C-alpha cells in the first residue's frame, strides 16, 4: 500500500498512487550451490569453520535503530539453550562497524554478554562478495525498531536465504502477510500496520518477530513517529526455530522467498522496479494537467490533523 495515500486522506482523492517496491539486480544477488568454487574460496578467506551447523548474518549500519545489542541479547538467549558442543557449531556474523558514534561499541556489548561465537566483519566488501556472504548464511536477522524497507532482507531473499525480522515498516511488506481472503495484505486507514500481529499467516521464508512495545517519539520537524520495539526473548525463539529446521528445510523456505521476490506479485528486482517506474511515468504524462498560475485559499479553512485510526487494531 502507498503510505502517501493513507497520509493524504481526502486530499489525495484526485491523485494517482502507484506502489513501486525496492528492486535489486538479481544477477548480482542470486542463489549459489554449496560447492561453487567462488563460494568455497570465500569461506576459506573468511576463515569460516567448515563444520558450522548454523550461521546467522546481520548486515547493516551500526546505528541505534538497527537494535544490534538486542540482536546480540537474543543470540545469547538462544545459545544458552544449546550444549557446549552445539554452541561451537553456531556463529553470528555482524557485517557492520565495530564501533560507531551513531550506534555503540559492539565489542563491549559482545564481551558483556559473554558470547564467544559472534564475529564482526567491519571491512568493505564488493557487491559480488556480499552475495557470497549471504550464501554462507543459514539466515539473516534484522530487528530494527524503525525501518523504511530493509534492503538486507531483499538481498537475503534473492540469494535464497530465509530471514528473522521485526514486523515494522517496509520489512513486513517482504513477509507477505495474508488477509482473510488469502491475498497479500493491503493496509488501510483502519489497519495501517500488522506490527502487533493481527494477521499471522505469512510467507514461509519469513520468521516474524512481532512488536511488543510502541512508543511515540519526535522532533520539531517530525513531531510524532512510532518507535517499535521487539522482545529479544521472542527473537531468540525465532532463532531456535530456524536452527531446528536443519539445512534442508532452511534451503527449501529460502527458495520459496527467492521465487516470490523474483515473481510478478512482489517484483523485487531492479528490472521489474524499473518497468513499474516507466509505466507510472507514462501514466503521469498521459493524465498530467498544468496547474493554474495561481489559486485562492481561505486561511480560515484549517483542518486539524487527527489520528485516523484506533490505537489498538
Residue ranges and their predicted role:
Residues 1-19, 24-32, 105-108:
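A short, active-site helix/loop in glycosyltransferases that binds the activated sugar's phosphate group
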Residues 30-49:
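A short helix/loop element that forms part of the nucleotide-sugar donor recognition site in Leloir-type
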Residues 48-66, 72-75, 92:
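Conserved donor-binding/catalytic core segment of Leloir-type glycosyltransferases
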Residues 103-128:
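Nucleotide-activated donor-binding/catalytic signature segment of Leloir-type glycosyltransferases, i.e.
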Residues 132-137:
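Short alpha-helical donor nucleotide-sugar binding micro-motif in glycosyltransferases
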Residues 145:
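Aromatic "clamp/platform" in nucleotide-sugar-dependent glycosyltransferases that forms part
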Residues 162-165, 175-176, 182-189:
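Short hydrophobic beta-strand element within catalytic cores of glycosyltransferases
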Residues 200-313:
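C-terminal amphipathic helix plus adjacent low-complexity
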Amino acid at each position: 500500500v502507498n503510505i502517501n495515500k493513507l497520509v493524504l486522506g481526502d486530499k489525495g482523492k484526485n491523485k494517482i498512487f502507484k506502489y513501486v517496491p525496492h528492486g535489486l539486480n538479481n544477477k548480482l544477488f542470486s542463489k549459489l550451490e554449496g560447492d561453487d568454487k567462488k563460494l568455497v574460496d570465500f569461506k576459506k578467506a573468511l576463515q569460516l569453520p567448515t563444520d558450522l551447523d548454523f550461521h546467522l548474518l546481520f548486515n547493516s549500519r551500526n546505528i541505534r535503530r538497527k537494535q544490534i545489542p538486542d540482536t546480540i541479547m537474543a543470540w545469547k538467549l538462544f545459545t544458552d539453550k544449546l550444549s557446549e558442543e552445539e554452541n561451537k557449531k553456531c556463529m553470528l556474523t555482524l557485517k557492520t562497524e565495530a564501533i560507531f558514534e551513531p550506534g555503540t561499541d559492539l565489542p563491549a556489548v559482545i564481551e558483556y554478554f559473554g558470547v564467544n561465537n559472534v564475529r564482526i566483519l567491519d571491512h568493505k566488501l564488493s557487491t559480488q562478495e556480499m552475495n557470497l556472504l549471504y550464501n554462507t548464511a543459514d539466515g539473516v536477522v534484522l530487528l530494527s525498531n524503525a525501518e523504511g524497507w530493509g534492503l538486507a532482507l531483499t538481498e537475503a531473499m534473492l540469494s535464497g536465504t530465509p530471514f528473522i525480522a521485526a514486523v515494522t515498516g517496509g520489512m513486513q511488506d517482504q513477509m507477505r502477510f495474508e488477509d482473510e481472503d488469502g491475498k497479500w495484505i493491503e493496509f488501510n486507514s483502519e489497519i495501517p500496520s500488522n506490527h502487533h500481529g493481527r494477521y499471522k499467516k505469512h510467507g514461509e521464508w519469513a520468521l516474524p518477530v512481532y512488536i511488543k512495545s510502541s512508543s511515540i517519539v519526535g522532533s520539531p520537524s517530525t513531531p510524532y513517529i512510532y518507535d517499535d520495539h521487539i522482545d529479544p526473548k521472542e527473537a531468540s525463539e525465532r532463532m531456535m526455530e530456524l536452527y531446528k529446521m536443519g539445512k534442508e528445510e532452511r534451503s527449501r523456505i529460502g527458495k520459496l522467498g527467492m521465487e516470490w521476490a523474483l515473481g510478478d506479485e512482489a517484483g523485487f528486482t531492479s528490472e521489474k522496479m524499473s518497468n513499474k517506474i516507466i509505466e507510472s511515468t507514462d501514466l503521469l504524462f498521459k493524465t498530467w494537467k498544468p496547474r493554474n498560475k495561481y489559486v485562492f485559499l481561505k486561511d480560515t479553512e484549517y483542518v486539524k490533523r487527527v489520528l485516523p485510526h484506533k490505537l489498538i487494531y
